Amino acid sequence: MANEERTIPETNVASERPEDPVESQTRAEGGEQIQEAAPETAELEAVQQLLEDARSKADEHWNELLRARAELENQRRRHERELEKGRKYALEKFAQDLLPVKDSLEMGLAAAQAEDANVTALREGTELILKMFNEVAARFGIETIDPQGEAFNPDFHQAISTQESSEAAPDTVLTVVRKGYALNGRLLRPAMVVVSKPGEQTTAGVDTQA
């Protein structure tokens, strides 16, 4: 018994070796970095998603803008076509009403060229044509300016000469050379007139010669 060897329990030297502080700190920092990387990745993905959403909305708004611009351009072109059509055919009704007047003038001219033309009939026909024209003009707001005997109005009358008159007041229209016309009160052309002016007053002279 005395000679029995004592068995010394083996121990793992490596496991009992003290841990290197530097290695421990490195592992700790690595773990922390892994833990910190996860939130950063999630945040980056969220930012990328927001960016994609913003790009999608920007594309949508851009397409809406393009459609709106195209619609405005189409409306502008339609408006221009309507204006052009309005300018081109604005006098269509007036022209249609004038055609009978032209027809009557042509018939009157043909009658005047006949060998047995009746002057009285031609005059009456001409008066009828003039009446037709005046009726057409009145329907479209054309007014005749015939200021015979009226006071001279430079807004509607054009004086081409003056004439002395002892009977008419100064600046009175004595003669209408050419009638004027207005459209709904707006002057088309002035009436050409002769206007009165005061006559020269003569005074009896005194003979101073003896």
Curated annotation (Swiss-Prot):
PROSITE patterns: GRPE. The keyword tRNA-binding does not apply. GO terms for molecular function: adenyl-nucleotide exchange factor activity; protein homodimerization activity; protein-folding chaperone binding; unfolded protein binding. GO terms for cellular component: cytosol. Residues 1-42 are annotated as: Disordered. The keyword Cytoplasm applies. One of its GO terms (biological process) is protein folding. It is found in: Cytoplasm. Keywords: Chaperone, Cytoplasm, Stress response. Belongs to the GrpE family. NCBIfam families: PRK14139.1, PRK14140.1, PRK14150.1. Homodimer. HAMAP family: GrpE. Participates actively in the response to hyperosmotic and heat shock by preventing the aggregation of stress-denatured proteins, in association with DnaK and GrpE. It is the nucleotide exchange factor for DnaK and may function as a thermosensor. Unfolded proteins bind initially to DnaJ; upon interaction with the DnaJ-bound protein, DnaK hydrolyzes its bound ATP, resulting in the formation of a stable complex. GrpE releases ADP from DnaK; ATP binding to DnaK triggers the release of the substrate protein, thus completing the reaction cycle. This is Protein GrpE.
